[in-house]
Each structure stands twice: as C-alpha cells, then as structure tokens.
Amino acid sequence: MIQQESRLVVADNSGAKEALCIRVLGGTRKRYATVGDVIVVAIKSVIPASDVKKGAVSKAIIVRTKKEIRRPDGSYIRFDDNACVLLNAGGDIRGSRIFGPVARELRATNMKIVSLAPEVL
C-alpha cells in the first residue's frame, strides 16, 4: 500500500535510485496504490551522469510492495521493499532492464515489465 510521501526504490536502469510518491492516480479519493497501479513520483536520488535528474517529476508503476497481496487462490505474497519502474510520457518503461522480482499481477497490464524481469513471483 503506497500513499503520498511513501518512498520507493526504482527497480530499473533509468538512472534514478529512489523516488517519492506525490500522487496516486485513479480517481479523486483514491488514497492507496498497490502492485500494478500508476503513481506520480518525484525523483529523490540518482546515480551520477544519468538522464534522470534529481527533483524531476515522472509517472511510475508499482512492481513490489511490503504490504501483502491476496491472490484469487487464497495465498498471499509480499516483498522486502516498495519498488517502482519509471514510465515516459507515452506510458512505456523508461529503462531497458528491471532489477529484482516482480509480482505476477503485472501480467494483466504490463507484459513488457514481466518479460524484462529476471523473476516473476
């Protein structure tokens, strides 16, 4: 469950390391975001000489959350961190690699993230 002011790890090679959620998209009263939701983030830390600049505002999709996700078969899955992947203006992912596992729930909407991920849980 990601809300405003939540800090997330950026799980791609776009150049950003950490992002801060500044808005959850999807309605006027939507407070929390989970895996597969799109949020607006501010970049808080970057690696040197990257295309992404500190303080830049971008859209991102959530790929991992610490809060467990209930699956239709009754099982739950949770991760060790909150992570996102940055999106460009067209809605495509900004980087060319994904780091760490991603949730299977992304298959319904984002096949590109699932195909680039090293592990899908």
UniProtKB/Swiss-Prot annotation:
Keywords: Ribonucleoprotein, Ribosomal protein, RNA-binding, rRNA-binding. CDD domains: Ribosomal_uL14. GO terms for cellular component: cytosolic large ribosomal subunit. PROSITE patterns: RIBOSOMAL_L14 (PS00049). Pfam families: Ribosomal_L14. One of its GO terms (biological process) is translation. InterPro entries: Ribosomal_uL14, Ribosomal_uL14_bac-type, Ribosomal_uL14_CS, Ribosomal_uL14_sf. One of its GO terms (molecular function) is structural constituent of ribosome. Belongs to the universal ribosomal protein uL14 family. Binds to 23S rRNA. Forms part of two intersubunit bridges in the 70S ribosome. NCBIfam families: rplN_bact. Part of the 50S ribosomal subunit. Forms a cluster with proteins L3 and L19. In the 70S ribosome, L14 and L19 interact and together make contacts with the 16S rRNA in bridges B5 and B8. This is Large ribosomal subunit protein uL14. It comes from Parabacteroides distasonis (strain ATCC 8503 / DSM 20701 / CIP 104284 / JCM 5825 / NCTC 11152). The gene is rplN.
